[in-house]
Amino acid sequence: MKKFLTVWGLLLFISITSYSQEKKYALYSVAFYNLENLFDTIHDAGKNDFEYLPNGKNKWNSMKYEAKLKNMSEILSQLSTDKLPLGPTIIGMSEVENRRVLEDLLKQPALSDRGYEIVHYEGPDRRGVFPVGLPISSE
């Protein structure tokens, strides 16, 4: 009887400890955001970006550009933070004028500590906005 109880207790202990071990998973988040014509104030040759120049239709200037960068970076910095403190691993972005505006965006205080690297493809959009920018976290 004592041997039976010892074996039974050992089996019970093994089964309890094997079920109580939590599986660990790596969690990644992917987000997408339309930056709605994120243009800088500098004309790019071959692009129809004239309405986003200081003398253009939108009277686009450094103050407006910096405000848009700040607002967009604050919004992007809040994506997925309910699950991941540093936000999404990958953020797809559309309506980005060029790589330079992505670099400016990622230098903003709200995003600068995230460790994002840029994958950008310059394409033939008639408005001067190619729809693909992809910051990817190296963390």
Where are these regions (language model features)?
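A well-ordered secondary-structure block
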Residues: 131-139
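Bacterial Sec-dependent N-terminal signal peptides
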Residues: 1-23
